[in-house]
UniProtKB/Swiss-Prot annotation:
It comes from Thermus thermophilus (strain ATCC 27634 / DSM 579 / HB8). Belongs to the RNase H family. The keyword Hydrolase applies. HAMAP family: RNase_H (MF_00042). GO terms for cellular component: cytoplasm. The keyword Membrane does not apply. Binds 1 Mg(2+) ion per subunit. May bind a second metal ion at a regulatory site, or after substrate binding. CDD domains: RNase_HI_prokaryote_like (cd09278). This is Ribonuclease H. Mg(2+) 1 binds at D14, E52, D74. InterPro entries: RNase_H, RNaseH-like_sf, RNaseH_domain, RNaseH_sf, RNaseHI. It comes from the Bacteria. Keywords: Endonuclease, Hydrolase, Magnesium, Metal-binding, Nuclease. Residues 128-166 are annotated as: Disordered.
């Protein structure tokens, strides 16, 4: 007896940041046939890349069973990590870049891998701000979330005596 086929779900994601770092927001739109679920959140002090990753993580975590997922993003950072082998290289080098520096956002990359594990995920690039309806929708919600976080500005960065590695 064959197992039942996985449900095919579309996941549209976006992240936004007012300043980089600054207040940020993320949004994920899940679609299964006529059913939709919009998820969103924000952080007071973050980066645009962290919000892009958070959107994908939260969208995948919301799925209640293993699915075939078409993930649509306007983030080259997110898509290329998988489609151009960046992530595989980072892991082989012990979470270091080709230049030997620690990979930024490792905590979220690891969380994303865990969230992806039960699913089959295909990444699709959508050019942002070109009228793609779902991308525009998650962009608006991510920006709204970022603006709602703007009441708490990022603390100033402490001066350092050393060059930063990351």
């Amino acid at each position: 007896m064959n197992p039942s086929p996985r449900k095919r779900v579309a996941l549209f994601t976006d992240g936004a940041c007012l300043g980089n770092p600054g207040p940020g927001g993320w949004a994920a739109l899940l679609r299964f046939h006529a059913h939709e679920k919009l998820l969103s959140g924000g952080e007071a002090c973050t980066t645009n890349n962290r919000m892009e990753l958070k959107a994908a993580i939260e969208g995948l975590k919301a799925l209640k069973e293993p699915c075939e997922v078409d993930l649509y993003t306007d983030s080259h950072y997110l898509k290329k990590a998988f489609t151009e082998g960046w992530l595989e290289g980072w892991r082989k080098r012990g979470w270091r870049t080709a230049e030997g520096k620690p990979v930024k956002n490792r905590d979220l990359w690891e969380a994303l891998l865990l969230a992806m594990a039960p699913h089959r995920v295909r990444f699709h690039f959508v050019k942002g701000h070109t009228g793609h309806p779902e991308n525009e929708r998650v962009d608006r919600e991510a920006r709204r979330q970022a603006q709602s976080q703007a009441k708490t500005p990022c603390p100033p960065r402490a001066p350092t005596l050393f060059h930063e590695e990351a």
